């Protein structure tokens, strides 16, 4: 059943007309609520607790029904802190799932899981709202066009190209650059693609959310003078929020993106940082609801929860949602159930490597681990495919030779292998790139490199035309012409020192 967005008059509150219950038990963020016989709320209905605590402070807590316990009781998970709640307090059944504002009114604003603005810029037009729980589009509505989504990041466009309307995962452990890469993608896509983006901050650092907001204002993605001209809506449920909020904030962001796709018929970008926190919050809620844990302590409903979110992120005949999701990998273990379940839904995986980050190569994208279903000659063309395969072969050969080099040194290799190693080291450095969003840290201006320029650069390295250039000339540059110019500068500098 697909529930369409509803339109209602502004400020109409129907809470007073609904069923009333009372709090029977409070266990952290979980509430048990008793209702009169025959007046039980449905699963996923929103319940509202209003009143005052012992100090007289106003309380307004929204919960979501998760279980019907019998004996006219339901168990609900709170979307905000339950401080100050007491047994016996009145609970209102709203009679419907959580609904959030959608449409143009959301652009340039920051929302919480309930769709309430948290940026102190005044109220949002809530005449058009949509429930966060909806079924995925029917099979017949889906669209299956295959086209590449250019990002301007060399390593991504060459080795693991993104699909327009596809799902992309950024995999990496702690501190290897997932959020910076997401911020660069938002920046590049807003400039080159000009579409609408929705950013879902799921259980990540509040500081990063604030940095992102400030950078969006600086780069013009959020237009402070005319908010309606902004290109992005932000939804945040950060690390300090209760698990209920972190579990549902992804659905809030997705609901806003679906409206742009289905009603406005736009191509939308949905960024989720971090999808692992969605699973983690689901695991916390599952334990609070008393379910038996499954593998590695995760919830038994892990695949179902992930599927219900991911199946809604898709392209229909009206428009597309291209989704880029950061995936934290616990202890760098890609076989952990959370990242492993996410892998199954993705069209492209960009794996970030701690080894490359340690070498100072950013973006630290692993050229051998990263994959894409789009890297086929019939989709990207023979030239792109051949270049990508040769880059991977050269990198793979270098990886195989590293043990020999570590023990015996470069001199023990054959002439051919030494040439392969020299080219692989140039390729490794040329896969790095200065980012626009990292200008403040690095001091070097960001670079957007088109796909044709990227392919030309790697072809020149592989052909041997640039064998005479020093490998440091290829580090943190844009296209290949910058590398040759940098090599000339290095030569001039070394001559001056002599």
From Swiss-Prot:
A GO term for molecular function: ATP binding
Chain residues that bind ATP: 172-179
Catalysed reactions listed for this entry: ATP + H2O + 4 H(+)(in) = ADP + phosphate + 5 H(+)(out)
One Pfam family this sequence matches: ATP-synt_ab_N
Listed Gene3D superfamilies: 2.40.10.170, Bovine Mitochondrial F1-atpase, Atp Synthase Beta Chain, Chain D, domain 3 (1.10.1140.10), P-loop containing nucleotide triphosphate hydrolases (3.40.50.300)
Major site of localization recorded for this protein: plastid
Enzyme class, broadest EC rank: translocase
Keywords: ATP synthesis, ATP-binding, CF(1), Chloroplast, Hydrogen ion transport, Ion transport, Membrane, Nucleotide-binding, Plastid, Thylakoid, Translocase, Transport
One cellular component (GO) term of this entry: mitochondrion
CDD domains: ATP-synt_F1_beta_C, ATP-synt_F1_beta_N, F1-ATPase_beta_CD
Gene Ontology process terms (BP): proton motive force-driven mitochondrial ATP synthesis
Protein localization: Plastid, Chloroplast thylakoid membrane
EC number: 7.1.2.2
Topology in the lipid bilayer: Peripheral membrane protein
Matching SMART domains: AAA
HAMAP family xrefs: ATP_synth_beta_bact
Homology family: Belongs to the ATPase alpha/beta chains family.
Matching NCBIfam families: atpD (TIGR01039)
Assembly, per entry: F-type ATPases have 2 components, CF(1) - the catalytic core - and CF(0) - the membrane proton channel. CF(1) has five subunits: alpha(3), beta(3), gamma(1), delta(1), epsilon(1). CF(0) has four main subunits: a(1), b(1), b'(1) and c(9-12).
Functional summary from the UniProt entry: Produces ATP from ADP in the presence of a proton gradient across the membrane. The catalytic sites are hosted primarily by the beta subunits.
Name listed for the protein in its UniProt record: ATP synthase subunit beta, chloroplastic
Source species: Cinnamomum camphora
Gene of this entry: atpB
């Amino acid at each position: 059943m697909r529930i369409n967005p509803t339109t209602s008059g502004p400020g109409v509150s129907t809470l007073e007309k609904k069923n009333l219950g009372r709090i029977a038990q409070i266990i952290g963020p979980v509430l048990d609520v008793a209702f009169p016989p025959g007046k039980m709320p449905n699963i996923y209905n929103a319940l509202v607790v209003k009143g005052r605590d012992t100090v007289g402070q106003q309380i307004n807590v929204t919960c979501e029904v998760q279980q019907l316990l019998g004996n006219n009781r339901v168990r609900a998970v709170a979307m905000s802190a339950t401080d100050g709640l007491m047994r016996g307090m009145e609970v209102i059944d709203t009679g419907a799932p959580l609904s959030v504002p959608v449409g143009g009114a959301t652009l340039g604003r920051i929302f919480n899981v309930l769709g309430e603005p948290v940026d102190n810029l005044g109220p949002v037009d809530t005449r058009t709202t949509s429930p966060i729980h909806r079924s995925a589009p029917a099979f017949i509505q889906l669209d299956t066009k295959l086209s590449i989504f250019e990002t301007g990041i060399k390593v991504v466009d060459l080795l693991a190209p993104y699909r327009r309307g596809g799902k992309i995962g950024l995999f990496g452990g702690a501190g290897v650059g997932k959020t910076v890469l997401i911020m660069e993608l938002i920046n590049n896509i807003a400039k080159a693609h000009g579409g609408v983006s929705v950013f879902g901050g799921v259980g990540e650092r509040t500081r990063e959310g604030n940095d992102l907001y400030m950078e969006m204002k600086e780069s013009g993605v959020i237009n402070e003078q005319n908010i309606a001209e902004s290109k992005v809506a932000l939804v945040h449920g950060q690390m300090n929020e209760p698990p209920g909020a972190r579990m549902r904030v992804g659905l809030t962001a997705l609901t806003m993106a679906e409206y742009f796709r289905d009603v406005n018929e736009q191509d939308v970008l949905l960024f989720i940082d971090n999808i692992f926190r969605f699973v983690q919050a689901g695991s916390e809620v599952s334990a609070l609801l008393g379910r038996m844990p499954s593998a590695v302590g995760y919830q038994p409903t892990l695949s179902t929860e992930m599927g219900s979110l991911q199946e809604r992120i898709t392209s229909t005949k009206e428009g597309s949602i291209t989704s880029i999701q950061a995936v934290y990998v616990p202890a760098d273990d890609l076989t952990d159930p959370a990242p492993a379940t996410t892998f199954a839904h993705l069209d492209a995986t960009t794996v970030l490597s701690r080894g490359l980050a340690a070498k100072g190569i950013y973006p630290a994208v692993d050229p051998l681990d990263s994959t894409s279903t789009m890297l086929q000659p019939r989709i990207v063309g023979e030239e792109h495919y051949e270049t990508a395969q040769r880059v991977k072969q050269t990198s793979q050969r270098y990886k195989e030779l590293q043990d020999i080099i570590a023990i015996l040194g470069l001199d023990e290799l054959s002439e051919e292998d030494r040439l392969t190693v020299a080219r692989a080291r140039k390729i490794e450095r040329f896969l790095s790139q200065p980012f626009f969003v990292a200008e403040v840290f690095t001091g070097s201006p960001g670079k957007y490199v088109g796909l044709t320029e990227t392919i030309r650069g790697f072809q020149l390295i592989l052909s041997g035309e640039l064998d005479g250039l020093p490998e440091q000339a290829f580090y943190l540059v844009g296209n290949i012409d910058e590398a040759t110019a940098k090599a000339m500068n290095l030569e001039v500098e070394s001559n001056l020192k002599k």
